[in-house]
Swiss-Prot record:
Protein name per UniProt: Glycerol kinase
GO molecular function, one term: ATP binding
Claim: ATP-binding is one of the keywords in the record: yes
Chain positions recorded as ADP binding sites: 11, 15, 264, 307, 408, 412
Functional description taken from the UniProt entry: Key enzyme in the regulation of glycerol uptake and metabolism. Catalyzes the phosphorylation of glycerol to yield sn-glycerol 3-phosphate.
Naturally occurring in which organism (per UniProt): Trichlorobacter lovleyi (strain ATCC BAA-1151 / DSM 17278 / SZ)
Binding site for ATP: 11-13, 264, 307, 311, 408
InterPro entries: ATPase_NBD, Carb_kinase_FGGY, Carb_kinase_FGGY_CS, FGGY_C, FGGY_N, Glycerol_kin
Length: 496
């Protein structure tokens, strides 16, 4: 019997999971790594530490499963997106720390491009907004600020990649410099309609084409691991950015199917099939995956503070000792008692995109308790999700029939039930909650025939629990109305 190894390289830790043919986790290892904050607004990672931690957990996960490298049929990779690495092709060494997706150092450059009237051009071609979040301006910053970097890039001596590219380069001993289409679509440099690097956008950001990786399908044998890393050379055959991998792992393979990942923030993706839907409501259009010549697309929206709001209750207010306690505390009251929290600690994401919004707690009376604040915090996660979903349904002209969910906060039954009540459709939690890693495993396995097709995969997907809506729609409409009032009060608070 053989197995698939999924490498799940995240923002705070590197993980590796071994899956069997039924999609069951047989081995898991995880290692955190340093977060580097040179100054406010700047976030970096040591790319070599990322590689070392990822290789270490890969070996450990296989050992914990009681297996050897000879038992691994293929490797799939999923990764934190947008985080930018540039390295020297000859030495294989990064020329600077990785600039993380959270980093805001290129805000002024994005503003400059907007003033030049270029946002519509970037949006139409890439499906993205001009924001420091994405890789393109990070890469331009590195070339502009590191002595000699631009000259080396022009001579083809440097390589750029998101984390998937960096891992593949190292796993193959420097033989392959590539990225999959889902990761390429997060760079601000990739034309999602033509499926290639956009030459005009490269010129606008002064990016030499020689520095870019080859763009490949999300499921294909790209190469094998170098012999020195494992006792056997293992095919690398699947890559997707973390949120696209979760969409694939949730088997959202038909237009209109939606998944929401509840983590520090929330990431919602709606599968739109082979049709890229350009949003009129501030959502992102992204490549979901490329399978052979077929490219599938998704609408995406993000919530900046979901689990982070619960962490604030723990670390900022001290009204809970662990994040798990929030459900118990929230259940001490029958409803929110008129209390609303807008957790805009770092502004508001889609569909509002207001960087100047700030956290707002409204409706407090002498009768308000810690339970009301805890409940308002959980409800804020569901409200923000509902805002995203409403925008997606309108953009895609496709009504939702169910929401598939994953991520740590889905263990909170009170939140999941309120989410179902608010949306008016079932919220479905899968049996296997490691959907991001599972998506990478599925992509890798399909490429080598470990699984034959998506029909076979769909038979593996099982719901652990479905939360059906039970509260009246009129009551939900009233809560949404008050939530919208609270959001409007939070907007623009930090405007200079």
């Amino acid at each position: 019997m053989s197995f698939i190894l999924a490498l799940d390289q995240g923002t705070t830790s590197s993980r590796a999971l071994v899956f069997d043919h039924d999609g069951t986790v047989r081995g898991l290892a995880q290692k955190e790594f340093r977060q580097i904050f040179p100054e406010p607004g700047l976030v970096e990672h040591d790319a070599e530490e990322i590689w070392a931690s990822q290789l270490g957990v890969a070996v450990e996960a296989v050992a914990r499963a009681g297996l050897s490298a000879a038992d691994i049929a293929a490797i799939g990779i999923t990764n934190q997106r947008e985080t930018t690495v540039v390295w020297d092709r000859r030495t294989g060494k990064p020329i600077h720390n990785a600039i993380v997706w959270q980093d805001r150092r290129t805000a002024a450059e994005c503003d400059r491009l907007k003033r030049l009237g270029l946002e519509a051009t970037f949006r139409a071609r890439t499906g993205l907004v001009l924001d420091p979040y994405f890789s393109g301006t990070k890469l331009a910053w590195l070339l502009d600020h590191l002595p000699g970097a631009r000259d080396k890039a022009e001579r083809g001596e440097l390589a750029f990649g998101t984390i998937d590219s960096w891992l593949v380069w190292n796993l193959t001993g420097g033989e392959r410099h590539l990225t999959d289409a889902s990761n390429a679509s997060r760079t601000l440099l990739f034309n999602i309609h033509e499926g290639n690097w956009d030459q005009e956008l490269l010129q606008l950001l002064r990016i030499p084409p020689a520095i870019l990786p080859e763009v490949v399908p999300s499921s294909q044998v790209y190469g094998e691991t170098a012999a020195r890393f494992f006792a056997a050379r293992v095919p690398i055959s699947g890559i997707a950015g973390d949120q696209q991998a979760a969409l694939f792992g949730q088997l959202c393979d038909r237009p209109g199917m939606v998944k929401n990942t509840y983590g520090t923030g929330c990431f919602m993706l709606m599968q739109t099939g082979e049709r890229p839907v350009l949003s009129e409501r501030n959502l992102l259009t992204t490549v979901a995956c490329r399978l052979g010549e077929r490219t599938e697309y998704a609408l995406e929206g993000s919530v900046f503070a979901a689990g982070a709001a619960v962490q604030w209750l723990r670390d900022g207010l001290g009204i809970i000792r662990s994040s798990e306690e929030v459900e118990t505390l929230a259940a001490t009251v029958p409803d929110n008692g008129g209390v609303y929290l807008v957790p805009a600690f770092a502004g508001l994401g889609a569909p509002h995109w207001d960087p100047y919004a700030r956290g707002t707690l409204l409706g407090i009376t002498r009768g308000s308790t810690a339970g009301h604040i805890a409940r308002a915090t959980l409800e804020s996660i569901a409200f923000q999700t509902a805002d995203l979903l409403e925008a997606m349904e309108a953009d895609a002209a496709t009504p939702l029939t169910e929401l598939r969910v994953d991520g740590g906060a889905t263990a909170n039954n009170l939140l999941m039930q309120f989410q179902a009540d608010l949306l008016g459709v079932p919220v479905v939690r899968p049996r296997v909650r490691e959907t991001t890693a599972l998506g990478a495993a599925y992509l890798a396995g399909l490429a080598i025939g470990y699984w034959q097709d998506r029909k076979e995969l769909s038979r593996l997907w099982q719901a652990e629990q479905a939360f059906a809506p039970v509260l009246e729609r009129e009551r939900m409409a009233e809560l949404r109305y008050n939530w919208n009032r609270a959001v409007e009060r939070s907007k623009g608070w930090a405007q200079p």
